């Protein structure tokens, strides 16, 4: 079962904290993030570089280019309403990285979820309080903000995750188990993985890597061989609870879209079809239709098999989620499906994914 790597300890309690896990379900929910409302907040932090012709940097060169832009995040949870017996507070640590020179920092939603206070430690050991700008549970992303001087802020360059290839070198920087500025390296093991966010909605096109990712790495950057952020480290798949060489990062293409919305509006909107897919089926078989959703209003029913969205062929539930992911709320899409041996096509107006 996938686990989200956030290092957790208990303050004023003898209980050991449990690691956060990404729950699995019998069905996968077909939704999408809104890729059509991207607002660039700080153009300088989203540089488009021609990495195809650039020579790869060494791990040390990547580290020296990026380490000042990576932060350690310590959150305090609980208090008088704490679920910990005795009302003790729980502290947890994760990672993050500087997104722009306004002090915005990108991390995972599960790092800051439920926090009553957030402290950010920078490369020089200085610590600042942070506030939550916005969170998006369905993509497990969050933006927080610190009021720090410009001399403290070293925004990382965001690369293009769509240009990654299997076998490309990658580097992770973060604070596993509270060990700040830890560097691990590996390769892109696979692309286009579908992982689960903090809800049942899937995060499409996630990056699988064998670079060591452990508890505390959550929210830290995955960097390409040019030192550009191509992912946000989010989950590991492990039977032991530790690194086994199967980690997952949220792609930078998703990060740019969601982060810009969170900074501009405090929330991110995602298109929504309103169906669940039978994950045991070899195709995009509808296991359920949520009431009063775009799919229900268009007449789709349980047992229908989706075969196309517009001109995109659909063979699996992941294909359907990815196809919807290419649109935004309010878009009209043509959905082709099979029912009882006959093929039908219906126009669906996509809605907005519920929280």
Briefly describe each language-model feature range.
Residues 332-334, 345:
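Short, conserved beta-strand segments of beta-strand-rich sandwich/propeller modules, principally
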């Amino acid at each position: 079962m996938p686990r989200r790597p956030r290092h957790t300890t208990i303050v004023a309690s003898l209980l050991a904290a449990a690691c956060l896990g990404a729950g699995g379900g019998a069905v996968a929910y077909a939704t999408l993030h809104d890729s059509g409302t991207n607002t660039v907040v700080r153009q300088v932090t989203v540089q488009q570089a021609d990495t195809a012709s650039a020579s790869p940097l060494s791990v040390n060169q990547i580290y020296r280019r990026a380490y000042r832009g990576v932060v350690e995040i310590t959150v305090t949870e609980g208090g008088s309403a704490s679920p910990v017996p005795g009302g003790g507070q729980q502290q947890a640590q994760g990672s993050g990285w500087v997104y722009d020179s306004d002090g915005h920092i990108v991390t995972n939603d599960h790092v800051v979820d439920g926090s009553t206070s957030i402290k950010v430690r920078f490369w020089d050991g200085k610590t600042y309080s942070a506030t939550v700008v916005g969170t998006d549970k369905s993509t497990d992303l969050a933006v927080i903000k610190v009021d720090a001087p410009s001399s403290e802020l070293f925004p990382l360059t965001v690369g293009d995750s769509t240009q990654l290839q299997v076998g490309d070198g990658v580097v992770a920087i973060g604070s596993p188990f509270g060990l700040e500025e830890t560097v691990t390296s590996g390769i892109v093991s696979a692309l286009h993985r579908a992982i689960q966010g903090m809800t049942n909605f899937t995060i499409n096109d996630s990056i699988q890597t064998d670079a060591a990712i452990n508890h505390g790495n959550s929210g830290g950057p995955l960097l390409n061989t040019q030192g550009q952020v191509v992912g946000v480290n989010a989950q590991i798949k492990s039977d032991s609870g530790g690194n086994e060489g199967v980690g997952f990062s949220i792609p930078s293409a998703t990060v740019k879209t969601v982060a810009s919305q969170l900074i501009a509006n405090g929330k991110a909107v995602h298109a929504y079809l309103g169906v669940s897919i039978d994950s045991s089926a070899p195709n995009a078989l509808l296991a359920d239709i949520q009431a009063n959703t775009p799919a229900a209003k268009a007449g789709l029913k349980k047992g229908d098999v989706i075969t196309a969205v517009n001109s995109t062929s659909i063979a699996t539930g992941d294909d359907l989620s990815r196809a919807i992911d290419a649109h935004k709320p309010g878009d009209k899409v043509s959905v082709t499906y099979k029912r009882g041996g006959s093929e039908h096509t219906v126009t669906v107006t996509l809605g907005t994914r519920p929280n």
